[in-house]
Amino acid sequence: MGELMAFLLPLIIVLMVKHSDSRTHSLRYFRLGVSDPIHGVPEFISVGYVDSHPITTYDSVTRQKEPRAPWMAENLAPDHWERYTQLLRGWQQMFKVELKRLQRHYNHSGSHTYQRMIGCELLEDGSTTGFLQYAYDGQDFLIFNKDTLSWLAVDNVAHTIKQAWEANQHELLYQKNWLEEECIAWLKRFLEYGKDTLQRTEPPLVRVNRKETFPGVTALFCKAHGFYPPEIYMTWMKNGEEIVQEIDYGDILPSGDGTYQAWASIELDPQSSNLYSCHVEHCGVHMVLQVPQESETIPLVMKAVSGSIVLVIVLAGVGVLVWRRRPREQNGAIYLPTPDR
């Protein structure tokens, strides 16, 4: 089980980070049911997150809800964990029944998955979002609209369930209240519990270097590491213009020390005199590394400290560093396949 969670948790983190806005805090619960699981895979798993931090886990092997963050264990009494353990044991059985029913409807056999995701987000301006959805075999199945108190069904099987669920007005109102009120209240409480971890800022250390990726092909790599929160924007510009279609991006990944790393690369045109610059934005600070045209080694390393850019090392050429504060405009909720309610 430990090996499986070691695989699942970073994967979910990567998915969340790729869609998150740095000004948003979120609480999400993911649940996964598996029919006919392979050896070592639990038939039911539940994981809770605040932002990209796992806070709770439950699985059908341990049959216990447990804290994944020390500040959760320190602030919630034993009866909390016991109460939600009992609820999740009920969810485990419910998932098993629902998955069997779906397999009958689809005439499926063998191993299949049923997923639930529920959560909420608190934006910097105080506004909130809430989301609840189900998936079958990794594909959207039912999506809740809390404003219209209705479910969006993706096929005829889902439509049958939609009709039954929408007939229960009390449950629809309960889900709406949980998303808009309870979830946000829990999120604010957890943010206070873990504020030293969740609300800190660690600026990125950014490097640019050249690398021969294939014989005769050279690329520029812009690498950022040691940053938190994990949301970061990186791009390359050629002669002052962004060239997204020419850029390769790496995923934003945990570094193992509570910080994150990411990279973006672009292939060099050896026949041109193009001027390349890497642009990195993190927590409102915008950094620019301009690459010296004749450099053959690592041209730049820099780090943002307390809202300003500090040149740490310059090798084989002089770089141009620019900084300014700029608000992020992108905004969006994260919809991933589950809550402990």
Curated annotation (Swiss-Prot):
It is a single-pass type I membrane protein. The chain crosses the membrane at residues 303-323. Induction: (Microbial infection) Down-regulated upon infection with HHV-1/HSV-1 and HCMV herpesviruses. HSV-1 targets ligand-free MR1 to proteasomal degradation; this process requires de novo viral protein expression with US3 acting as immunoevasin partly responsible for inhibition of MR1 expression and antigen presentation in response to bacterial infection. Whereas HCMV has evolved ways to shut down both ligand-free and ligand-bound MR1 expression. Residues 23-109 are annotated as: Alpha-1. PROSITE patterns: IG_LIKE, IG_MHC. CDD domains: IgC1_MHC_I_alpha3. Residues 23-302 are extracellular. 7-hydroxy-6-methyl-8-(1-D-ribityl)lumazine binds at R31, S46, K65, R116, Y174, Q175. Inhibited by pterin-based metabolites such as 6-formylpterin (6-FP, a product of folic acid photodegradation). 6-FP competitively inhibits MAIT cell activation by 5-OP-RU. Modulated by commonly prescribed anti-inflammatory drug metabolites. Inhibited by salicilates such as 3-formylsalicylic and 5-formylsalicylic acids. Activated by diclofenac and/or its hydroxy metabolites. Its main location: membrane. Residues 110-201 are annotated as: Alpha-2. Pyridoxal binds at K65. Glycans are attached at N107. This is Major histocompatibility complex class I-related protein 1. The gene is MR1.
